Curated annotation (Swiss-Prot):
Gene3D superfamilies: 3.100.10.10. Keywords: Ribonucleoprotein, Ribosomal protein, RNA-binding, rRNA-binding. Residues 22-38 have a biased composition (Gly residues). It comes from Myxococcus xanthus (strain DK1622). Residues 160-169 have a biased composition (Low complexity). The keyword NADP does not apply. This is Large ribosomal subunit protein uL15.
Length: 175
């Protein structure tokens, strides 16, 4: 068994740093591997990706399209196969337990249940949204689905301002 203090890189698994422009004998003298003269041989060769030699580039010829709505609702997706794998019969799968078992990771506005896979166990599911097929499959297995409303998110500062807390009073002029 190998130990950490005996680990070694495989032979020839790294390259020596190229020292360019240091004489003809090195093989990388004179033009330093940049070929002859021209824009690419100069320093500051900053043509952007997509440059077409002065012709109007493709990304400027085509129109802009679409956008990402800043206030969209993003759901974490949980499938029936996930419930089958992580929960025993008679269990309750709510948002908190879904996070604990690792089915919901990261920040989402809510959890949505979809019908991919099969469910044979009686499970009670408490989520924000569920597809009709998922509801039917859970009820067929003897379980139940409860949909809870999404909590409207207010930033802390907006909530404080709305409650009248943390709002500074106007400064009084000096007498």
């Amino acid at each position: 068994m190998s130990t950490l203090n005996k680990l070694q890189r495989p032979a020839r698994s790294w390259h020596r740093k190229k020292r360019v422009g240091r004489g003809q004998g090195s093989g990388l003298g004179k033009t330093a591997g940049r070929g002859g003269k021209g824009q690419k041989a100069r320093t500051g060769n900053m043509r952007f990706e997509g440059f077409e030699g002065g012709q109007s580039p493709l990304q400027r010829r085509l129109p802009k399209f679409g956008f990402t709505p800043p206030n969209r609702t993003v759901y974490a997706v949980v499938n029936l196969s996930d419930l089958e794998q992580h929960f025993d019969a008679g269990a309750t799968a709510d948002v908190e337990t879904l996070r604990k078992v690792g089915l919901v990771k990261g920040r989402y506005h809510g959890v949505k249940l979809l019908a991919r896979g099969e469910l044979t166990k009686k499970v009670t599911v408490v989520v924000h949204k569920a597809s009709e097929a998922a509801k039917a499959a859970i009820q067929k297995a003897g379980g139940a689905v409860e949909e809870i409303p999404l909590v409207a998110h207010k930033p802390e500062s907006a909530a404080k301002a709305h409650a009248g807390k943390g709002v500074k009073a106007p400064r009084q002029p000096k007498a």
